[in-house]
UniProtKB/Swiss-Prot annotation:
Primary location: virion
Primary role: RNA-directed RNA polymerase that is involved in transcription and genome replication. Following infection, it catalyzes the synthesis of fully conservative plus strands. After core assembly, which consists in recruitment of one capped plus-strand for each genomic segments and polymerase complexes, the polymerase switches mode and catalyzes the synthesis of complementary minus-strands.
Protein's recorded name: RNA-directed RNA polymerase
Organism listed in the record: Eriocheir sinensis reovirus (isolate China/905) (EsRV)
Gene Ontology cellular-component terms listed: virion component
Length: 1217
């Protein structure tokens, strides 16, 4: 294959995309017809007024000449316009006039529709949904009645309380889910209660719709009057159900959920563009979208009642088997999969027929096409289309995006205690205690891990500031109200400055209510442990939304000092849970794999699930689904965990008397006392503020450090009991002995691989006997476990939204790049947004979408991004970078035909001078777009305000006990005072300031970016490596050979529904096992400084930045080392090691050379062995140096060429010409 010919075609395609983009941008800003090319080389900041007509609607295409060829290179388009001013517009159609009066932002769409009407087009009106009077009967309006009704409510703010919802009311189904009721049918008041206002407020809070693009232009340019789904939406919108959008907030004039109906239409079109589904599935998707559009959030909740059961049984009892993975390889440390190319033997699934029948009966009333598809899919065999079809129900319920539920009622449902005292038999109590003991005791091996002096404890707290596992206390925060922040702009720097274009300013409130800031200013809030205060304090709760109609999740963080307690007593345990390496010998060792894996990908970490659902019939998988697991962890179960912790304390540490009524200094408390306080905190309840209520939570708290550990312990203990009692009680009754081969537990999610003791195939009777015993035992323990959502099978299984069907892996399909949970996407800056969209794209690629479709979708959506936005008075400036900026460093650096190969695009520089100019121009553009000069301005002014109001008192003096120099009277040699122990206070002030909101920083950064663009002063980027040409030759495939199904060859990758190019790489090169790692230079420096025993407040990136400015001088490097606090011996070693680190630092800053692995590429075999096999000696390249990072770099670039060829089905070898 001529890879370079393909690369040239990719580049030609990018030029075509760029041309379409350049023509599209002005059309997305309605009324802008004036377009002009502007060559920024010739502009200069002093001539901006002469080059830009301020205050007019115009689009400037910006160009800059390449320094080699002097050919102008398109940078992007700058749109200038005034803020929206709407004039009176009159239409010949009353409905359009009504919409314009309420929401004039829709004028471009209304103009379009008016022309359609003129041409004879029409759309019928959809029937609105009237208000249900029974809703008022579901409201609790008396705070006293409300408090009495809910046992977990310990207090009510009588002034704030106006209403609550009875979730289990007999009068109405799911009253806590907001409905799409016609606003005109909702009474203003019901018995004095302001019903209309109440429901409108609910819709704004609960029915979220944060679109990642500019909504109106996106709709106008993508709408099709003849498309069935667009017509469905227009049947609502044009007949009264319109709304006014305003950056995530919506004023509805028809129904309460007009905006969610539009979201369904947008998400539907995105799904059908990207998902290669069957015609039957497309019909089901169309049917489901129309059903959801009628009443988006409620109908999503209705679909959840039947979709889950029918989805999990997809391909559960197929009529044929065509997959077989070899047992060899999965039980060793070798390649995870050996394809047998044999038909799988018959397998079985324990199916809850009653649950299937119930789901069928419900679903046939609403989405019969979907239900028929799902029922038919149960007997189908695995294929790419069938796999995707099996998850169409999930894809449908995700069309409503983030649709939560009423917060207080959700919280009460989440935390409400059962009406009985849970029975915890001694055998379960002992099992929970044993698991807790094992995990905690192991975390203190060797015992030195528990030896924490005061300095080490404070250092743990310092490094824990970025975690979200605790709340900041309500007091001890600095709030500076109404501080003036000035920022100069390209306007104010122009020659003739009038008042209209004077320097800008804004008034902002600076709120330091942030955990990092609080730790640095008031660490005593964390290390002074007051049991009485913790349990009487009212803690603010949080919340998050989840796709697919699931209820709002309430987050309950720890009190600050309890957080500190856990990072001292439990941090090792939590870390150990998350640091298991996958091992295929698990199948022989009965090893329990913890909550997560190092470097894990599905085919590696969960290979036994693939094996158990394909050819090895002596294995099967059992997946259990617990309901409200968190709230089942209180009472005697919590006591069992506390008992296990105290067994460790009593065994390993001297006994101490710890009084709960005392206030304890955690910096000095012995480990036995810390474990005692941890054990007591597990058994106790905490109070959380949720709107108008204070709720007591005595179960596992969702925002604490040990949430997953605590859920894991009970899950594992119960699982052991299910298994042990089965073999003890059921085997004597004639059932076969069963062994546990592997357990995967993540909190309340469990998937266990079971094996017959005699290694003979499972029968259906074996599975049913074991599965039924599990539920009998769970009922005995009074665990709430859903039988209809649990399954036992050696054909299909599921673990944490990863589906395994006949050995194939299918990942969840709910992810989308169209909407976000919060408005943060638009507030994070353009380049961060681009990188996030890219990450989502490659994740979807590994699940169901094809490369070409994904790239086309990204390019089609690019003109509708916000771009770099800057406002000055009534004027707005929008800069939209060229699509070619995705080729340059600082972006993913991708080519259209291989978006999974991050950084590969720099290969274009070997094609010629123009291509080199293009790469450098796009890299400079990206560096400019990533500029943080505005942030620097902002933070320097904030620092001045802090100094004026607080002087030197902002940082707690306790940090001087952590960051100090042993040597007395040391005199600094370099100028980098903030990095030294003596300068730690200044450094920590900077760290506090960095926690402030991004909004002000973004405003100032954008002003600076547009100034640099218009002046032609883009940031220069050094290319550390020059790309070289490789000679490509054919070699035998080393990956998974094709399998034959009914005589037809087919790719055999386990990711069978994923992008075909990805699967070809698995064939030609192979699946990943232990890929080559490229540790970042900051990671390497951190390890080096730690080996020297240095305790410093400075992060490695800032140290490297300081060193880079010293010039290549070993004396200066040694001086920097001593300034940091190193001994003379270590400073000399530091000076010797630093040049190599600085080389890598320059490489990473210049080109991000070693940033490669993403969701897709992580599955490719890029191991040392694979590279040795596929890439020849690069040392004969004059640019490379043996045994250096340059050699590694060029070997990796050669491997990228091999991966690129493999995407097209070619197994290649790369050598240097």
């Amino acid at each position: 294959m001529d890879t370079y010919g393909s690369i040239k075609r990719d580049l030609k395609y990018m030029y075509d995309v760029e041309e379409v983009f350049r023509n599209t941008i002005p059309k997305t800003y309605f009324g802008i017809d004036d377009v002009e090319d502007l060559h920024v080389d010739e502009a200069g900041i002093s001539n901006i007024h002469n080059n830009i007509t301020l205050g007019t609607k115009k689009c400037y295409h910006l160009y800059k000449k390449g320094h080699r060829t002097q050919v102008p290179i398109y940078l992007g388009s700058l749109v200038t316009r005034e803020s929206n001013e709407y004039e009176d517009v009159s239409y010949s159609y009353d409905n359009l006039n009504t919409i314009y009066k309420d929401a004039p932002v829709w004028e471009p769409l209304l103009n379009k529709v008016s022309k359609w009407y003129d041409e004879g087009w029409s759309v019928p009106s959809s029937k609105p949904i009237p208000y249900d009077p029974n809703y008022s009967k579901c409201l609790i309006l008396s705070p006293d009645k409300y408090k009495k009704y809910h046992k977990v409510v310990v207090d009510v703010d009588y002034d704030a309380f106006h209403w609550s919802i009875d979730v289990n009311s007999e009068f109405m189904d799911m009253p806590n889910v907001i409905r799409a009721w016609d606003i005109s049918t909702i009474p203003q008041f019901v018995d004095g209660f302001p019903m209309l206002k109440h429901l409108i407020d609910r819709s704004k809070k609960e029915a979220l719709f944060y679109f990642n693009y500019r909504l109106i232009p996106y709709v106008v340019h993508n709408i099709d009057k003849d498309d069935d789904m667009w017509r469905e939406w227009l049947s609502y919108f044009l007949h009264g159900d319109h709304f006014k959008p305003d950056r995530g907030s919506y004023d509805n004039f028809g129904s309460l959920l007009g905006h969610k109906r539009l979201e369904v239409a947008l998400m539907y079109h995105n799904r059908i563009r990207l998902m290669p589904m069957s015609a039957t599935a497309l019909d089901a998707m169309n049917e489901g979208a129309k059903f959801l559009m009628k009443d988006p959030t409620y109908h999503t909740a209705v679909m959840k009642k039947y979709n889950g059961v029918l989805t999990q049984y997809g391909m559960a009892e197929p009529l044929g088997y065509n997959r077989g993975w070899g047992y060899t390889g999965v039980t060793t440390a070798d390649s995870p999969f050996i394809l047998s190319n044999v038909n799988g033997a018959d397998g079985y699934t324990v199916i809850d027929r009653e649950a299937v029948e119930e789901a069928k009966e419900i679903g046939m009333q609403y989405t019969p096409k979907l239900v028929k598809l799902q029922l038919a899919n149960m007997t189908k065999t695995s294929s790419p289309v069938n796999l995707i079809d099996s998850l169409i129900g999930n894809a449908i319920i995700s069309l409503t995006g983030f649709a939560g539920s009423e917060k207080v009622s959700t919280a009460l449902d989440q935390f409400e205690k059962e009406n009985f005292e849970r029975k915890v038999p001694d055998e379960l109590f002992t099992a929970i205690s044993n698991v807790t003991y094992e995990m905690v005791r192991e975390s203190f091996q060797p015992l030195e891990r528990s030896m924490l002096d005061k300095r080490t404890r404070l250092l743990r707290l310092y490094n824990a500031g970025t975690s979200a596992s605790s709340s900041a206390p309500p007091g001890a925060r600095y709030i500076f109200n109404k501080k003036m922040i000035m920022y100069s702009t390209f306007l104010s720097k122009s020659i003739d400055v009038t008042d209209e274009y004077a320097p800008m300013s804004f008034i902002t409130s600076l709120n330091f209510n942030n955990k990092t800031a609080n730790i640095l200013t008031h660490p005593q809030n964390y290390y002074m442990y007051d049991w009485h205060d913790n349990h009487n304090r009212i803690i603010n709760s949080g919340s998050r939304e989840v796709r697919g109609g699931r209820a709002t999740r309430i987050i309950t963080p720890d009190p600050p000092s309890n957080y500190m307690l856990l990072i001292l007593g439990a941090l090792n345990t939590v870390r150990d849970m998350g640091s298991h390496r996958t091992g295929f010998s698990n199948l022989g060792m009965n090893e329990v794999v913890g909550s997560s894996f190092l470097d894990a990908v599905s085919h590696d970490a969960l290979a036994p699930q693939c094996l158990a659902t394909s050819s090895s019939r002596s294995l099967c998988a059992q997946a259990l689904d617990y309901s409200t697991w968190d709230r089942q962890q209180g009472g005697r179960i919590a006591e069992a965990k506390a008992h296990g912790i105290m067994r460790v304390a009593n065994e390993l540490f001297p006994n101490t008397n710890t009084n709960l009524s005392d206030v304890h200094n955690l910096l000095e408390l012995p480990m036995s006392s810390i474990l005692y306080l941890w054990s007591e905190s597990i058994k106790s309840s905490y109070k959380y503020k949720i709107d108008h209520s204070t709720v007591a939570v005595d179960a596992v708290r969702s925002g604490e450090l040990t949430t997953q550990f605590s859920n894991h312990v009970t899950n594992l203990a119960a699982l052991r009991q299910y298994h042990e009692t089965y073999n003890r009680t059921k085997v004597p009754q004639g059932f076969r002995p069963i062994e546990v081969a592997q357990i995967n537990i993540v909190g309340d999610d469990v998937n266990v691989i079971l094996r017959t003791a005699d290694r003979k195939p499972f029968t259906l009777r074996d599975m049913e006997g074991y599965h039924n015993h599990t539920f009998e035992k769970a009922a005995e323990y009074e665990f709430s476990i859903s039988k209809k959502r649990s399954m036992m099978s050696n054909v299909a299984t599921e673990h944490i939204k990863q589906y395994f069907k006949m050995g194939d892996i299918l990942l969840d399909v709910m992810l989308s790049s169209m909407t976000s949970e919060r408005n943060t996407f638009r507030e994070q800056g353009y380049m961060n947004g681009i990188n996030l969209l890219y990450d989502i794209a490659v994740t979807i690629m590994a699940r169901y979408a094809q490369n070409d479709k994904l790239f086309e979708d990204m390019m089609a959506n690019l003109p509708f991004m916000e771009g770099v936005v800057y406002r000055h008075g009534s004027q707005k400036y929008h800069f939209h970078p060229s699509p070619c900026h995705l080729l340059g460093s600082g972006s993913p650096e991708i080519l259209p035909s291989a978006i999974d190969l991050r950084t590969f695009a720099r290969v274009i520089t070997v094609l010629g001078d123009y291509e080199s100019d293009l790469y450098e121009a796009m890299s400079s553009l990206n560096a400019t777009l990533l500029s943080t000069s505005g942030t620097t301005q902002f933070e320097s002014q904030v620092r001045k305000h802090l100094s004026e109001e607080l002087g030197d008192n902002i940082i707690s003096p306790v940090w001087s006990e952590v960051f100090y120099r042993d040597e007395v009277g040391y005199e600094m040699v370099t100028k980098h005072n903030k990095l030294t122990p003596e300068g730690h206070r200044e450094y920590l002030v900077d760290r506090i300031i960095s926690t402030l909101s991004n909004r002000e920083k973004l405003i100032m950064n954008n002003a600076d970016i547009i100034e640099k663009l218009l002046s032609g002063k883009l940031k220069k980027v050094k290319r550390y490596f020059q790309e070289i040409k490789f000679k490509m030759s054919n070699m035998p495939i080393t990956g998974l050979p094709d399998r034959k199904i009914e005589g037809v060859s087919e790719l055999s990758s386990p990711y069978r529904a994923a992008d075909v190019g990805m699967r070809r790489v698995h064939k030609c090169i192979g699946l990943s096992r232990r890929n080559l790692k490229f540790p970042s230079v900051t990671e390497r420096l951190s390890r080096l400084l730690k080996s020297y025993g240095l305790v410093t407040q400075a992060d490695s990136a800032k140290i490297l930045s300081a060193a880079a400015g010293l010039g290549r001088s070993s004396t200066r490097y040694r001086n920097l080392g001593t300034d940091l606090g190193l001994s003379d011996m270590h400073a000399s070693s530091f000076a010797q090691r630093l040049p190599a680190l600085l080389t890598q630092y320059e490489i990473e800053n210049a080109s991000g050379s070693f940033t490669f692995y993403d969701t897709v590429s992580r599955t490719y075999d890029v191991s040392e062995a694979s590279m040795n096999e596929r890439v020849g000696d690069v040392s004969n390249n004059p640019i490379a140096r043996a045994n250096s990072s340059t050699s590694t770099y060029y070997r990796f670039r050669g491997m990228l060429h091999c991966l690129y060829g493999a995407r097209f089905g070619l197994s290649l070898h790369a050598s240097v010409e």
